[in-house]
């Protein structure tokens, strides 16, 4: 063998042996720089499957586990160190108060961990806004918590779940997301968990906030427009660790020719508070007012809200003499969010004046 080749061969071999370990070291260094994000899966459409790609509205929710969701978006590895947990596997219309508590306590445990930088929760869209607001009230952390879902199952043509999940992890990984309360990422927008609601039930641009989004996500980068104005998370007086159960709060709907039957039945069935989902400015029919006055005298809290689609804003002592009736107004919260705040608030107080303060501040 040529002497030069004899000299080169061992050197080349040594280089080949060194390269893989150098690549591994570089990969490890990259992973150390990435945020650590935990994805908590609860089911919903984002984990759903249809019979064919043409089925975007008819499908079975809560079919895929968290590992398959993560595997379906391999690009997640480029923006975060991701691991998943299956907390539950249900369609979100079936989520109970006990499920809220279970999820909330697991989020709190993870938020305390030094090796967790952000948390993403995959969720069905039907009650996503309720869960997001609940967590916004009770999680004592400034770490990013992002709730995400999809309007189409992953088996559908032009499914939105993969990009929504990618955006959620990107937002949860972003240090700028800290201290902004619980967030919702859908359709490239970053929404406040307090403000956002499902406004459309069939389109991908389904989630809207009456006061506009907090920001947007474009190719994994967050762009922020505003901050939350109400108390939340670290500034909240509520703590999931101190809540073991939630009181029964129900919603009754106001409409033309309404009677007081539903209100009385809900109270007889154990409701500690009733959310009146009223027309317009939380208006109450003259056929219902006497029953609500009587229920309040018997200890049931009466909270007026509005069921208008966007931007309901209930003014105190407008339409009804709330001071005289000892009722509470929900301010700009829709009925379902008013129910969430009432439940959480009533773990601390039964006083209507205190409840009204809480509704102003949260």
From Swiss-Prot:
Signal peptide segment: 1-25
Keyword Hydrolase recorded: yes
Disulfide bond residue pairs: none
GO cellular component: periplasmic space
Gene3D superfamilies: 3.40.50.40, L-asparaginase, N-terminal domain
Keyword ATP-binding: no
Pfam families: Asparaginase (PF00710), Asparaginase_C (PF17763)
MF (Gene Ontology): asparaginase activity; glutamin-(asparagin-)ase activity; glutaminase activity
One biological process term in Gene Ontology: asparagine metabolic process
Catalytic activity: L-glutamine + H2O = L-glutamate + NH4(+); L-asparagine + H2O = L-aspartate + NH4(+)
EC code: 3.5.1.38
Location(s), subcellular: Periplasm
Keyword annotations of the record: Hydrolase, Periplasm, Signal
Chief localisation class: periplasm
Subunit: Homotetramer.
Family: Belongs to the asparaginase 1 family.
Protein name per Swiss-Prot or TrEMBL: Glutaminase-asparaginase
Lineage summary: Bacteria, Pseudomonadati, Pseudomonadota, Gammaproteobacteria, Pseudomonadales
